[in-house]
């Protein structure tokens, strides 16, 4: 039936994991263990295409996992986290002549659980993190093409909510948090083709309105007394922004394509930073309902130049000025008198300067070589509350990265070799500590059988077993070997 189709896919992964705490950071007693993992997913889609003007598809996405956190004291499985994710999405779309449209609706529910255990003052403590997140929304873009232009107009609505808490098992303590955020956006864009399609001009404007409300935080109990000063209803807040974009592309010949662009971006904070106080990946942190959105002005110039029939070069330079940049900083307060307490704050100004260059070479059919270099220099420029951070580089932002691959698809099997390099990365906001740069090499072999019905592949990641540090606390897994078998039932 050419008007009706069904797509179905699923997967399951399981691993005993590895212990990523280096010997130099282990303590006595040593509670570190391997970080196990098991996950599975199911995706189903039904498509109905009766006419060109009206088409519909309905999709369902299910994901569940259980991942060890690398520490075990008393709990049978040690510390772990678990996601139960369900998403339903429908899409209506079609076209007639120069007109086309889309309308997408979605709803998703995510139930999260994390078991956390620790030793404090010689006593065992355990608390379970439970949170329920609901998200729903819609987006509808309309597009009308003219002889020399293409005009688009649309709107988007997103609503997200969280109801979560840290529930202590070894005591009656609890930390509860709630909050909702609603974002309404409208946008318009026009693309103009000039001088026989040698020049393309794009002009766009987007309006965003974000509203944080229904915020609540409550901490009860002796073990969480450092947080109970923040108890109560959180302040409602609304932010709005108008974001323009202008881009110009020049194509004098088929071998040359150059562009210059300016755009402004707007990003509201996540609910965890607005309404949740507790433990995050940085450590203990407190909510900041006053946390405004992040804004950025981005300037970019670049292009693609075909140097020969088989060789192309694509360089770009960019400069971005961030305002009210979202960044975790220490508050100056201590938990238990020793652990820094963090809060996501708006850093007044951040400058990001960078270069990226991409080289693609196809010497003959079946062989492709790619080499990419990027330079990135993100610095705090004006942070009035913490002037000592001015001119410091953002954490986990390597200045230099090199990556590339060689891909052969002209033989019995497809073979790929790839490598990547990252330079030193600072791990503290004052740039007093850093992890060293590292280089990784991978190899992959794959092949389709039976007219693309059966896929068999294998890869070795980090062939030379480079046990570098991924963060200031955690070490990489080293050499990994994967085998993948997939069956395509849709052919």
Predicted regions and their residues:
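Outer-membrane beta-barrel signature, preferentially recognizing the C-terminal barrel domain
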Residues: 74-95, 131, 175-183, 232-243, ...
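Surface-exposed extracellular loop regions of Gram-negative outer-membrane beta-barrel proteins
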Residues: 3-20, 55, 59-66, 101-120, 159-166, 209-229, ...
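Transmembrane beta-barrel wall of Gram-negative outer-membrane proteins
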Residues: 1-14, 25-66, 84-96, 144-147, ...
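C-terminal beta-signal and adjacent terminal beta-strands/loops
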Residues: 15-21, 266, 321-323, 379, ...
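Repeated loop/turn-to-beta-strand initiation elements of outer-membrane beta-barrel proteins
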Residues: 3-6, 53-56, 98-101, 148-151, ...
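Extracellular loop and loop/strand-boundary signature of outer-membrane beta-barrel proteins
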Residues: 27-32, 69-80, 87, 119-130, ...
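Gram-negative outer-membrane beta-barrel transporters
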Residues: 194-196, 201, 209, 314, ...
